[in-house]
Structure formats: C-alpha cells, structure tokens
Design a protein with these regions (language model features):
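A polyanion-binding, active-site-adjacent surface
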Residues: 2-3, 14-160, 164-172, 179-181
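Short, contiguous pre-domain boundary segments
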Residues: 5-10
Length: 182
C-alpha cells in the first residue's frame, strides 16, 4: 500500500498504529501476494492522493472497486476510457445528461477528484470476481475515515450511492449534509 502524505497522514496517522490497521495491512499484503486484487497496490489510496483533505467539497461513497481486470483505478466509479462501461458509470453519465445537460464522454473521473470530489469506496480493495469480499476487513478503517471527514470545519456533502454506502450515514456528523440514494 502506498504511503499517505500531508494532511491525510496527519489525520490518519493514529489509525496506522492501531492493531486493526496492522491486521488489515497484513491481510491486504497477503491477498496481493496470493490472489488477483484490484486496484493495483499503488492505487489503493489514490482517492486520498488526488483529493487533499482541505479541498474536499463532496464525498461520493460507493461499495468497492470494480472486480474485473483493467477497470479499478482507486477512485470509486471511475473507469479508464478504454474499459467497457459499467452499469454504475452508465447511470452517472445518464444523470449528468438528463439532470444537468452535461454530455460527458470520459469515464475517467480523475478531474472530479482534483476538483474536490473524494471518490471513495467503503472497501478500498477487492479480490477478482468477489464483490464486497474484503468489506469486513476495511470497515474499521473506512468508518474512522468517514468520521474524521465529517468532523472537518468545512461543509462536506456526503453522497451515499448503494446499500453498502448508505450504512455509513450513521458515522457522519449531523452538521454535514447527506444525499442518500440507491
């Protein structure tokens, strides 16, 4: 797993010392050495690398990375432009067009991340063909991350897409707006 720097390292450094995180780290390391896991190991924290904490305006929370080769990029819902369009991306593109009149052709959402949209999954890794298979291991870390985000001074809009993401509403401070949809 790649190292976090700056604001993220400061906010999460305490978590990295906790027993649950050591177990998570060892589990993920073992999974990468014995199975096909997505995204690539150097992209696990890509959402945090691309979106500085102080710049976050919106958190879009999904379930887990795409679980087939050549798709997961470390950003929830984002796909390489040459990848087959997945149902979730098809819905995003449709809603952009229908609701906002935006005709977006790129499936790569990196530009959103750089503009303050944290594209985060509740599980940051997934074994090939095993959707939500690593969710329990990631739950403590993702919970603490969401709690920390929701306690920031700035207003952050939390968009919870899917049943797994909606379970995280209870960890979001009441001062932060939540948009919850299936």
């Amino acid at each position: 797993m790649s190292e976090l720097t700056g604001e993220w390292k400061e906010v999460l450094s305490g978590e990295f010392k906790k027993p649950y995180y050591r177990s998570l780290y060892e589990f993920v390391k073992e999974e990468y050495s014995t199975h096909t896991v997505f995204p690539p190991a150097d992209k696990i924290f890509e959402a945090l690398h691309l979106t500085p904490l102080s710049k976050i305006k919106v958190v879009i929370l999904g379930q887990d990375p795409y679980h087939t080769p050549g798709q997961a990029q470390g950003l929830a819902f984002s796909l390489p432009d040459d990848a087959p369009t997945q149902p979730s991306m098809r819905n995003i593109l449709k809603e952009l067009k229908d609701d906002l009149g935006i005709e977006r052709t790129s499936q790569n959402l990196t530009n959103w991340a750089k503009q303050g949209v944290l594209l985060l999954n509740t599980s940051l890794t997934v074994e090939e063909g095993q959707p939500n298979g690593m969710a329990d291991m990631w739950l403590p870390f993702t919970t603490r991350l969401i709690e920390n985000l929701s306690k920031q001074d700035q207003t952050i809009i939390f968009v919870l897409w899917g049943k797994q993401a909606q379970k995280f509403a209870e960890f979001i401070d009441e001062k932060q707006p939540i948009i919850s949809s299936a």
